[in-house]
Amino acid sequence: MKVIFMGTPEFAVPTLKKLIAHHEVTAVFTQQPKAKGRGLSLAQSPIHQLACEHQIPVYTPSTLRNDKTINLINKVNADIIVVIAYGFIVPKAILDAKKYGCLNIHPSDLPRHRGAAPLQRTIIEGDKTSSVCIMRMDTGLDTGDILMKEDFDLEERTTLKELHNKCANLGAELLINTLVNIDNIVPIKQSSDGITYAHKLTKQEGKINWQDSAYSIDCKIRGMNPWPGVYFSYDDKIIKILEAEYLNVDHHFTPGTVISDKLEIACGSGILQVKKLQQESKKALNIEEFLLGTRILKATVLK
């Protein structure tokens, strides 16, 4: 099958690799190179780099919503368009441009976690199960019919990186299976029940509210690392918690109270045991190294 691929980040790489191995990728669309590093040199997206390695034509339009880009896509010989974390809204003229339309890999149990940050919200909200869906795109926000889906259980204390890698690889396999069987698949409309939206994360969401349970704070730590990170303020400095564990135990302390010399912190319910931290503009340290340079005294109430 001839395929146009649209994608940008590392999450999309396994699928493009599978498509290159099993089909003919006739064009790749990705985000424009962005300034990166201290020298602000332009860096190509992971998808851009992979396409160049395989001599696939690459296009980096600033928008899909103009006649020039739409005409270009119409001229590219392809049966289908595959879109994964591209970064642009795909207009109807492109959704309808090819025989089999546009397919999208979405890493959640649709209609739960429609939107920009399904992986992060799955962990932040403490979901015990999730899915990868192959969806035929329409003009709505992740509202298209489901062609194929695979459910799975989340392991205890799954990290964002672990979930990202699992869904990226599972999605690639699922998409290839979808293309093999596409003429025989009966699309399934999404349920009108259980709709939630995985809104894009903000930096402000990372600020810890110690009134929350230790469990929910731990979920945020695992779901917001590396960005925006979960943090608290101490001595006018921002300190990110990179790793922690939670204890479901009763206590009588004010939430935010440091209750041990090893930086165990009382929460609205339960206790958070901090394992790894990073003070702004400094390197990440495990708790023992951190406390050698920064004293946070027992009985301190963190804000």
UniProtKB/Swiss-Prot annotation:
Enzyme Commission code(s) on record: 2.1.2.9
Any Pfam family matching the protein: Formyl_trans_N
SUPFAM superfamilies listed in its UniProt record: FMT C-terminal domain-like (SSF50486), Formyltransferase (SSF53328)
GO-annotated molecular function: methionyl-tRNA formyltransferase activity
Enzyme class: transferase
GO cellular component terms given for this protein: cytosol
Keywords assigned by UniProt, alphabetized: Protein biosynthesis, Transferase
Superkingdom of origin organism: Bacteria
Catalytic reaction list: L-methionyl-tRNA(fMet) + (6R)-10-formyltetrahydrofolate = N-formyl-L-methionyl-tRNA(fMet) + (6S)-5,6,7,8-tetrahydrofolate + H(+)
Residue sites binding (6S)-5,6,7,8-tetrahydrofolate per the record: 108-111
Claim: Cell membrane is one of the keywords in the record: no
Gene3D superfamilies given in the database record: 3.40.50.12230
CDD domains referenced in this protein's UniProt entry, alphabetically: FMT_core_Met-tRNA-FMT_N, Met_tRNA_FMT_C
Family of the protein in this entry: Belongs to the Fmt family.
HAMAP family per UniProt: Formyl_trans
Described function: Attaches a formyl group to the free amino group of methionyl-tRNA(fMet). The formyl group appears to play a dual role in the initiator identity of N-formylmethionyl-tRNA by promoting its recognition by IF2 and preventing the misappropriation of this tRNA by the elongation apparatus.
Name the record gives this protein: Methionyl-tRNA formyltransferase
Organism, scientific name: Rickettsia canadensis (strain McKiel)
The encoding gene: fmt
